Amino acid sequence: MHGLLLAGLAVALPLGVAGHPARPQTALSPRGIDVNAYRFTSTAKYNEHKTTSQMVQSFAYSKDDDYVATATKLVKSTFPNMTFRTVKDHYIGTNGIGHVHFKQTAHDIDIDNADFNVNIGRDGKVFTFGNSFYQGEMPKTNPMVKRDYSDPVKALHGAIKTLKIPVKPESAKAMPMDEVETFKFEGTSGALSEPKAKLVYIQKDGNLHLTWRVETDVGDNWLLSYVDSKESETVHNVVDYVASADYKVFAFGLNDPTEGQPSMIKDPWNTTGSGSPFTWHGDGKTDYTVTRGNNVAAQDNPSGGSQWENNYRPDSPQLSFVYDYSDQMEPEDYKDFAITQLFYTTNTFHDVLYSLGFTEEAGNFQVNNGNKGGKGNDFAICNAQDGSGTNNANFATPPDGQPGRMRMYTWTTSKPKRDGDLEAGIVIHEYTHGLSNRLCGGPANSNCLNDLEAGGMGEGWGDFYATAIRLKQGDTHDTDYTMGEWAANQKGGIREYPYSTNMQTNPYTYADVKGMREVHGIGTVWATILYDVLWNLIDDHGMGKNVMPKMVDGVPTDGRTLAMKLVLDGMTLMPCNPNFMQARDAIIDADMALTKGANKCSLMKAFAKRGLGSNTKPGKGYTNNFDMPSGC
């Protein structure tokens, strides 16, 4: 779950669509489910480029193999006695790296948290790879032969009872779907879509456990609950997909109403690259006169309900979305302006990310992919002034082919209330959950930021992109930024420290992760490190006036968009459920792929400054190391 919890307020805050907290932090959902208690523990290993180059020197390449075949050969040679399947989400990124993902199996049943990702370079050779394959003893018999497991309906009842999921299963019937031992449940009520169950193994505590993976979408939580196949009230683990024309808007780069005034912007898709070929108001089949198109459907949702398609949207046959806003107005009195702002911010960010490599093949959010790969029919459903909560926001990211869902709330921390739709940093943070969940582990797997440390980096990436985009001309290495300060009406923002390169202003280092038990605190450490990365690259390459990247041979020409590109490319390289060290190495490897390592020393200088030096030790010790690699 992803959202925005804040700190130090004398109000009752919703605790679980995980707000973007800062100080006192909790992992409880609105119903009291402690999702942190059910997180998977990552077993991922990542082989960065230098190590991979040495390891695969003897690997047998064939000039006749395509990148998928080469990746498959590597998996077979690494684990010759294991079975696996190729996940159908492979693609070649804009940096020329091919990405292929594999899922380990046992008796043709998926081991749901056992993954192998292979990244193939432009030369056709293995660039990097990572895996979390299970290497223990395999089950000797196929459980499907004697059906040695409970009925899936019992698993549904068990998940609902144990986790207090607000779904009524009394009349549930399991109806077979196309995949083996996969069912949907008819006759339930309370979920936004029919619950599903699939028989899968999971690895836990060094052993395999046969489970029913029960999927329930109830809005604030979209859960995958791994229920023991025999003891239906035993839930081993849980994954949550939720992370908490003419337009008169605050222009992209203005974070909130304190930074400027609304202005008129005409046909913005003409200046945001090739990400929106149908404009923002069409999907190749239908042209809309409301705030709906190929990338985004933005509407109000005052009831907080699950319906969105027929909800209110501003409508202008002339595509003139010009509405009034004043900081003296209550949010419901400027809902047209708020919906338009949300539509503008999310579409612009979609186009920025598209130019950086979050394309159709990579799993982006679009209805019509235009025969460019990936799965369509999955734009972002964005609810403005959603009535299901306050002082918060969240984004749900199912796998590619299913729409993402953003819920933006009003904030009751000032009079009049404030609307999170008007703070671009919150919107960008939420949308970035969609980016990171689609890229890490591949677009078909949204379970790869479930480990506590990995989930923390998911929060940190959101803050990083929100902060990078709000930088202004004239900012320097000494400029500090906060998160959520305007919406929360809280000086200093909703994080423990502002983002700063000054160690006195923000003293966070890698060692501070030790002892943290909540993703937002961990995320603040990660975003702090990336803020130093950002400014080292800006100091080296400058910062363009426009956040839309200018490219030369696929490489951004300024430091800000180069940092955004390297962080994005790093997500595509790292293994499922990565840790800080693996994410650091993946960013270094992304630079190797993009610039042949031209920025390695500047990157490592930032990492080492915050304790992630070249001799940092793996494991959960979280001991700082400030060493630079040889050659820097």
Curated annotation (Swiss-Prot):
> What are the protein's UniProt keywords?
Glycoprotein, Hydrolase, Metal-binding, Metalloprotease, Protease, Secreted, Signal, Virulence, Zinc, Zymogen
Required co-factors? Zn(2+)
| Classification via SUPFAM superfamilies | Metalloproteases ('zincins'), catalytic domain
Q: How is the cofactor bound?
A: Binds 1 zinc ion per subunit.
Where does the record place Polar residues bias?
294-310
Gene Ontology molecular function, alphabetical: metalloendopeptidase activity; zinc ion binding
Q: Which residues form the signal peptide?
A: 1-19
Gene3D superfamilies linked = 3.10.170.10, Neutral Protease Domain 2
Q: Where is the active site?
A: E430
CDD domains hit by this protein: M36 (cd09596)
The Gene Ontology biological process annotation of the record reads:
proteolysis
| Coiled-coil parts of chain | none
Pfam families, per this entry?
Answer: FTP, Peptidase_M36
Q: Does the keyword Mitochondrion apply?
A: no
**Top-level lineage group:** Eukaryota
What does the UniProt entry say about where the protein is found?
A: Secreted
Q: Which residues form the propeptide?
A: 20-244
Annotated Gene Ontology cellular component terms = extracellular region
Against InterPro entries, the record matches this protein to: FTP_domain (IPR011096), Fungal_virulence_M36 (IPR050371), Peptidase_M36 (IPR001842), Peptidase_M4/M1_CTD_sf (IPR027268)
Establish whether keyword Zinc is in the entry: yes
Which residues bind Zn(2+) per the record? H429, H433
Q: What class of enzyme is it?
A: hydrolase
Known EC number(s)?
Answer: 3.4.24.-
Give the PANTHER family listed for this entry: EXTRACELLULAR METALLOPROTEINASE MEP
- Tell me the function of this protein: Secreted metalloproteinase probably acting as a virulence factor.
Q: Can you say what this protein is called?
A: Extracellular metalloproteinase 2
Annotated organism of origin: Arthroderma otae (strain ATCC MYA-4605 / CBS 113480) (Microsporum canis)
